[in-house]
Amino acid sequence: MTERIFRYLREQQPETPCLVIDLDVVENNFRRMRELLPAAHIFYAVKANPAAQILARLANLGSKFDTASRGEIEMVQQTGVSMDRVSFGNTIKKEKDIAWAYQQGVRLFAFDSEAELQKLARVAPGARVFCRVLVDCGGAEWPLSKKFGCAPEMAKDLLRKAKDWGLDAYGISFHVGSQQTDLEQWDRALAQVSQMFFALAEAGVDLRMVNLGGGFPARYRAEVSSIDAYCEAVGRALVRHFGNRMPEVIMEPGRSMVGDAGVIQSEVVLVSRKAANDRKRWVYLDIGKFSG
């Protein structure tokens, strides 16, 4: 908890539950990532915390935005940023939402299936598209290795089709899992992705972007490596696998940008036992989903 948050809670004594964010911490996290990986484009993952004040602060700092829904795009629009700073990064979208986003000026879209690619070809002609591939998520607290992404061979086939169908086959994305504790997972993923780049180039599909996704952990109670260590590991992996053929780089930090910036203050509503001889106590807070 920062001194500013502590002072606010002490002086204002807000009704609970109350979430307080120190925007200076968010800004410092952004600036540090940009300093450590200056060539990377930072797309803040809006789903991590879409509070208007956070989006506005990041917009003023030059951040771009990774969005997963029409609602998130509309939140970003409220900051006044141009839509060329927005990625529609969800690989599962309604066709009408793709069409709407395209009309608003969004030109960067994710996909991981032929059906999704067909939607993009129909209602977002000429858009830049990137395919999400499946990678190893070992070491992550929340693996994302099944629901999103496709096998590398399928991804190569889809990117060839993207070019044939009038889309801009822009690049490849991956996600090593949320709260990833193994720094080497980005190296393993980039080894796989770089080979896809080179194979597609030989087939006449010149990709230009690699999206590192998120996964950079926030520090809660358990200790994790510093963001410096993560960014240095990613930088080494990029050089190792792409050398002088370096593509554009996108990263999508979410909780690592905001997770350590706030505190939720709650109240203990009830402490009880379920039987006279029960030694376990149940502690109920006013922040529970079902009011307890």
Where would I find each of the regions flagged by the language model?
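A charged N-terminal "starter" segment
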Residues: 1-127, 164, 168, 202, ...
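Active-site-proximal loop/turn and secondary-structure-junction residues that shape catalytic pockets
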Residues: 25, 48-50, 71-72, 92-94, ...
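Structural preference for beta-strand elements that scaffold enzyme active sites
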Residues: 41-43, 64, 83-87, 108, ...
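Alpha-helix N-cap and loop-to-helix initiation/capping positions
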Residues: 21, 93, 115, 143-154, ...
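Conserved anion-binding
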Residues: 112-168
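Active-site-proximal beta-alpha loop/turn segments in soluble metabolic enzymes
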Residues: 55, 102, 134-147, 171-185, ...
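C-terminal active-site-proximal or functional interface alpha/beta core segments in diverse enzymes
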Residues: 185-292
